[in-house]
From Swiss-Prot:
The gene coding this protein: hatA
Provenance organism: Dictyostelium discoideum (Social amoeba)
Biological process annotations from GO: actin filament polymerization; hyperosmotic response; response to acidic pH
Family the UniProt entry places it in: Belongs to the hisactophilin family.
A Gene Ontology term for the protein's cellular component: cytosol
CDD domains hit by this protein: beta-trefoil_FSCN_HatAB
Top-rank taxon: Eukaryota
Subcellular location: Cytoplasm; Cell membrane
Region Contains several HHXH repeats: start-end pairs: 8-109
Stated name of the protein: Hisactophilin-1
Lipidated residue numbers (N-myristoyl glycine): G2
Function noted in UniProt: May act as an intracellular pH sensor that links chemotactic signals to responses in the microfilament system of the cells by nucleating actin polymerization or stabilizing the filaments.
Length: 118
């Protein structure tokens, strides 16, 4: 499906740095590029260093060294030209105005991203 960057409502790009999921403000680079892999109706988001964006049992966002089953699979929900990343526990990836990445149970502006094709 190709490479994407995800820019939050607040102008922060989702970013994979080391072992953490963070955000970058204002620009995107290789840390913010995710390869979207199709997995039968769901997608996996693979980082530039080969790790997978994942949501754990306690709703934390983390990077996995391998495809970690449902923890690493998402639905991309499109809303008016934007996208939300919904995980297996029906929680959305969220980036707040401070750039903190977490999950939320409900869809709102913090869970909505501009999807940029790289």
């Amino acid at each position: 499906m190709g490479n994407r960057a995800f820019k939050s409502h607040h102008g922060h790009f989702l970013s994979a740095e080391g072992e953490a999921v963070k955000t970058h403000h204002g620009h995107h680079d290789h840390h913010t590029h995710f390869h979207v892999e199709n997995h039968g109706g769901k997608v996996a988001l693979k980082t530039h260093c080969g790790k997978y964006l994942s949501i754990g049992d306690h709703k934390q966002v983390y990077l996995s060294h391998h495809l970690h089953g449902d923890h690493s699979l998402f639905h991309l929900e499109h809303h008016g030209g934007k996208v939300s990343i919904k995980g297996h526990h029906h929680h959305y990836i969220s980036a707040d105005h401070h750039g903190h990445v977490s999950t939320k149970e409900h869809h709102d502006h913090d869970t909505t991203f501009e999807e940029i094709i790289i």
